[in-house]
């Protein structure tokens, strides 16, 4: 699949979607994107900057949601212009799709909305690539239906049907907890869409702090290594210069100063994993 100016897939090196959970300021966005561009450029990892203008599903009404669509899109446009990287953000309503698609390179759908047929179809008809997150409540094989909805919508609009990614971000495991089943990454390949692993939301503890979500960032490297060793097209990770002060999802954000070391390990694993193909394809 062609994404931005590079190809993605199991026969290609993994690409990275990374950035702060929510846009906190223009300077932080530009600085973070610049640091990530420098790191990924040195490692040869294709990179897309991600940050949200609105967190529409926060745990409580008191939680910081973001700077709003108008200001958020202005900042993302500046990141794209000044840093020279493609940008991605999530949308939550059909009315947001057109203005957001006019600015960003890639759209992302929230996990909670993966079953909303009209929403998925509208995103698919935007003309932009879409990273579709699997709901925490959804079986991995059910993502085929979601991807098929997107493909059918694209076909109806006369658009390419190969512009969609399937993103794993963990499955609900009792109350306030998620678990990652690495088999899901192989199962989701059967959708025919490139598979992305969200390593930071997979260690989230939803609502675990009462009025906000908790997280276990120490397990991000563990799950990221496992996912890359399983074989994925891309990795999604949220990062922050100072996670303790982050306005959203700080407990599961990777400290920006640790990204180079983590990505270096993932790059080596990815090369090794994809060098000789996938044995599971021979187990029939």
UniProtKB/Swiss-Prot annotation:
Keywords on record: Cytoplasm, Lipopolysaccharide biosynthesis, Transferase
Homology family: Belongs to the KdsA family.
Gene Ontology MF term list: 3-deoxy-8-phosphooctulonate synthase activity
Gene encoding the protein: kdsA
Catalytic reaction list: D-arabinose 5-phosphate + phosphoenolpyruvate + H2O = 3-deoxy-alpha-D-manno-2-octulosonate-8-phosphate + phosphate
Subcellular location: Cytoplasm
Pathway(s) annotated for this protein in UniProt: Carbohydrate biosynthesis; 3-deoxy-D-manno-octulosonate biosynthesis; 3-deoxy-D-manno-octulosonate from D-ribulose 5-phosphate: step 2/3; Bacterial outer membrane biogenesis; lipopolysaccharide biosynthesis
GO BP field: keto-3-deoxy-D-manno-octulosonic acid biosynthetic process
GO cellular component, one term: cytoplasm
EC number: 2.5.1.55
Organism for this UniProt entry: Ralstonia nicotianae (strain ATCC BAA-1114 / GMI1000) (Ralstonia solanacearum)
InterPro entries: Aldolase_TIM (IPR013785), DAHP1/KDSA (IPR006218), KDO8P_synthase (IPR006269)
Main location: cytoplasm
Name of the protein in question: 2-dehydro-3-deoxyphosphooctonate aldolase
